[in-house]
Amino acid sequence: MVSIRPDEISSIIRQQIEQYDQEIQVSNVGTVLQVGDGIARVYGLDKVMSGELLEFEDGTIGIALNLEADNVGVVLMGDGRNILEGSSVRATQKIAQVPVGDAVIGRVVDALARPIDGKGDIATTDTRLIESSAPGIISRKFVYEPLQTGITAIDAMIPIPRGQRELIIGDRQTGKTAVAIDTILNQKGQGVVCVYVAIGQKASSVAQVVGVLQEKGALDYTVIVAANADDPATLQYLAPYTGASIAEYFMYKGQHTLVIYDDLSKQAQAYRQMSLLLRRPPGREAYPGDVFYLHSRLLERAAKLSPQLGEGSMTALPIVETQAGDVCAYIPTNVISITDGQIFLSADLFNSGLRPAINVGISVSRVGSAAQIKAMKQVAGKLKLELAQFDELKAFSQFSSDLDKATQLQLARGERLRELLKQQQYAPLPVEEQVAVIYTGINGFLDNIETKQVSAFISNLRENLSVKRAKFGEIIRSEKALTAEAENLLKDAISDCKQAFLSNI
């Protein structure tokens, strides 16, 4: 018979008492009162933060936006078809975060940075909050480095420095996206990480952009964030913030980044839809009262950081679509007041054959020539003046039939300057070629060449400089100035080209 020892039993009980770990899990749970149109009303979530992620029974995630006395207004990040009235909702005590890091480069992701390109998961452990504070005044440095777009009209007259926010504004089908894509293509080999955010666009349009970037080898340094037209309004609202978070990761590592938001008009419309469904009071054009803050907190995240923070930068190129050229509408005026300047694309110029259709008269960069190399400053000042005088004379000449010789010559030169600013799509020019092209125009070397022949002459000149006089490009790239030696090389190239060109006509 087995003997029972009381001391042994008591020691076993003592061990089990010591190992006992009482853990009470308290979860904040609510009940769905109403659901529909991408919005859910939830009762019982007493301890929930604004912007907190909530999980529904079917696995759908939502964001708490409206905190009211008796319910919480939640926007859904999915279709929410399986959410029923009376089903439970759990607070996660988390704010929306997205994966970031080098592994994201070259990928196409959705508004929550989940891959949608069929290339598998993104192998990264780093995350950033979708909404984070913009750098303060002490954290910033004055912008001074040029971000070359490869578009002559912009780099010469509306220069963009690294860390600036420059608005691209114009009617639909005026080439806004083309300007942005050219800018991405021109960053090849410059060490700039590009983020292209497509908001509310057709999937076919996004696929076309991906195809162009892949073909030109630009996808190797670009991330594409896509919230397509068929995605919920919540994802279209979040996509720009996700793009900014991805770019911020590289900025705080001391790298240079470029973010393109295409376009913020659609984000504002998605936010208006959400706000009206949440029964927030409508304001001008039915937008909610905080629509200015929607864009200001996004665009303020673009900055040139101080040396203490690594001197990284985030340059933002937001795009806004206008209706019939009306820049005085609510969203355009808001974004114009937030940004550091705007590039205005005109439908009239586009239809007249001037592409890119940049209206230099009302386009502006508030930083100006601080973002230009010395060589560009040497030639760009005269170009602005010549074009301004040309526009004035052209308007005047419509009312006068007999013009003096000097006026006729100035009008002829203006026509040729306009012609040399034309560029093919997806063919950005390096800065040394831009300097050569502008120098040729402003110094009258094109005056005896027919306007329709200017494009062919410029093409021959660029080829001559790159093949026979490569030293010209080397001097501009290294010295950043149009030295006497570079100017002589350029004059020789122009002379050779003119001789060959005029003999063939």
Swiss-Prot record:
<keyword id="KW-0066">ATP synthesis</keyword>
<dbReference type="InterPro" id="IPR023366">
    <property type="entry name" value="ATP_synth_asu-like_sf"/>
</dbReference>
<keyword id="KW-0194">Cyanelle</keyword>
<keyword id="KW-0139">CF(1)</keyword>
<keyword id="KW-0547">Nucleotide-binding</keyword>
<dbReference type="Pfam" id="PF00306">
    <property type="entry name" value="ATP-synt_ab_C"/>
</dbReference>
<keyword id="KW-0375">Hydrogen ion transport</keyword>
<dbReference type="InterPro" id="IPR000793">
    <property type="entry name" value="ATP_synth_asu_C"/>
</dbReference>
<keyword id="KW-0934">Plastid</keyword>
<keyword id="KW-0813">Transport</keyword>
<keyword id="KW-0406">Ion transport</keyword>
<dbReference type="InterPro" id="IPR020003">
    <property type="entry name" value="ATPase_a/bsu_AS"/>
</dbReference>
<dbReference type="InterPro" id="IPR036121">
    <property type="entry name" value="ATPase_F1/V1/A1_a/bsu_N_sf"/>
</dbReference>
<feature type="site" description="Required for activity">
    <location>
        <position position="363"/>
    </location>
</feature>
<dbReference type="Pfam" id="PF02874">
    <property type="entry name" value="ATP-synt_ab_N"/>
</dbReference>
<dbReference type="GO" id="GO:0033115">
    <property type="term" value="C:cyanelle thylakoid membrane"/>
</dbReference>
<dbReference type="GO" id="GO:0046933">
    <property type="term" value="F:proton-transporting ATP synthase activity, rotational mechanism"/>
</dbReference>
<keyword id="KW-1278">Translocase</keyword>
<feature type="binding site">
    <location>
        <begin position="170"/>
        <end position="177"/>
    </location>
    <ligand>
        <name>ATP</name>
    </ligand>
</feature>
<dbReference type="GO" id="GO:0043531">
    <property type="term" value="F:ADP binding"/>
</dbReference>
<dbReference type="InterPro" id="IPR000194">
    <property type="entry name" value="ATPase_F1/V1/A1_a/bsu_nucl-bd"/>
</dbReference>
<protein>
    <recommendedName>
        <fullName>ATP synthase subunit alpha, cyanelle</fullName>
        <ecNumber>7.1.2.2</ecNumber>
    </recommendedName>
</protein>
<comment type="subunit">
    <text>F-type ATPases have 2 components, CF(1) - the catalytic core - and CF(0) - the membrane proton channel. CF(1) has five subunits: alpha(3), beta(3), gamma(1), delta(1), epsilon(1). CF(0) has four main subunits: a, b, b' and c.</text>
</comment>
<dbReference type="Pfam" id="PF00006">
    <property type="entry name" value="ATP-synt_ab"/>
</dbReference>
<dbReference type="InterPro" id="IPR005294">
    <property type="entry name" value="ATP_synth_F1_asu"/>
</dbReference>
<keyword id="KW-0793">Thylakoid</keyword>
<dbReference type="InterPro" id="IPR004100">
    <property type="entry name" value="ATPase_F1/V1/A1_a/bsu_N"/>
</dbReference>
<dbReference type="GO" id="GO:0005524">
    <property type="term" value="F:ATP binding"/>
</dbReference>
<comment type="function">
    <text>Produces ATP from ADP in the presence of a proton gradient across the membrane. The alpha chain is a regulatory subunit.</text>
</comment>
<dbReference type="GO" id="GO:0045259">
    <property type="term" value="C:proton-transporting ATP synthase complex"/>
</dbReference>
<dbReference type="InterPro" id="IPR027417">
    <property type="entry name" value="P-loop_NTPase"/>
</dbReference>
<dbReference type="InterPro" id="IPR033732">
    <property type="entry name" value="ATP_synth_F1_a_nt-bd_dom"/>
</dbReference>
<dbReference type="InterPro" id="IPR038376">
    <property type="entry name" value="ATP_synth_asu_C_sf"/>
</dbReference>
<comment type="similarity">
    <text>Belongs to the ATPase alpha/beta chains family.</text>
</comment>
<keyword id="KW-0472">Membrane</keyword>
<keyword id="KW-0067">ATP-binding</keyword>
